[in-house]
């Protein structure tokens, strides 16, 4: 954004076209309703936005009135997927590979630490550390630990991340 904004302004000025500022996260939320045939949802509603850099719960009162009620404190959910995948030796982006291998795994094979944040904010750094320590301990005992447990590890990682998201969203609904 830091580099793109001046370039965008210069381009718009040079082409004599308007430059319309759009909030990146609002665009994520409202992009689903761009289709002219789609009806806007009833307001208010909650939106869970998950990406590599952001994890947010947003209360939407109208297309122009939004309130973030839970946000990323350290690492976002997408980053937790990608960093976990890196620990497993997968290429970037790792989230799709974790999802692929998780389909054949047992979600209860491994348990990882859960964040102890009481409000609606998200923290995935502790979970990432727990995943790292579990894998390091397994590799110390068995050099083939990742290969032999890849599906179960992926299923357990995915389950842990998604459970955190669902728990926070459920709390926000109440």
Regions found by a protein language model. Give the residues of each.
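Active-site nucleophile and cofactor-binding loops and adjacent substrate-binding regions
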Residues: 1, 19-27, 48-50, 73-76
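Conserved phosphate-binding catalytic cores of ATP/NTP-utilizing and phosphoryl-transfer enzymes
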Residues: 17, 22-45
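Short beta-strand scaffold segments in enzyme catalytic cores
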Residues: 47-49, 55-59
């Amino acid at each position: 954004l830091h580099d793109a904004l001046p370039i965008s302004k210069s381009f718009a000025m040079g082409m004599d076209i308007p430059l319309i500022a759009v909030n990146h996260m609002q665009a994520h939320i409202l992009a689903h309703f761009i289709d002219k045939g789609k009806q806007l949802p009833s307001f208010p509603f909650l939106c869970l936005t998950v990406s590599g850099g952001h994890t947010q719960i947003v209360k939407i009162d109208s297309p122009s009135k939004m309130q973030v009620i839970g946000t990323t404190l350290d690492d976002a959910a997408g980053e937790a997927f990608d960093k976990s995948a890196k620990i497993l030796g997968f290429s970037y982006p790792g989230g799709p590979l974790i999802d692929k291998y998780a389909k054949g795994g047992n979600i209860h094979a491994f348990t990882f630490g859960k964040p102890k944040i009481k409000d609606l904010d998200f923290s995935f750094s502790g979970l990432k550390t727990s995943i790292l320590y579990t894998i390091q301990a397994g590799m110390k005992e068995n050099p083939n630990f990742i290969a032999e447990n890849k599906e179960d590890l992926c299923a357990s990682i995915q389950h842990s991340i998604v459970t955190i998201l669902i728990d926070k969203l459920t709390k926000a609904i109440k």
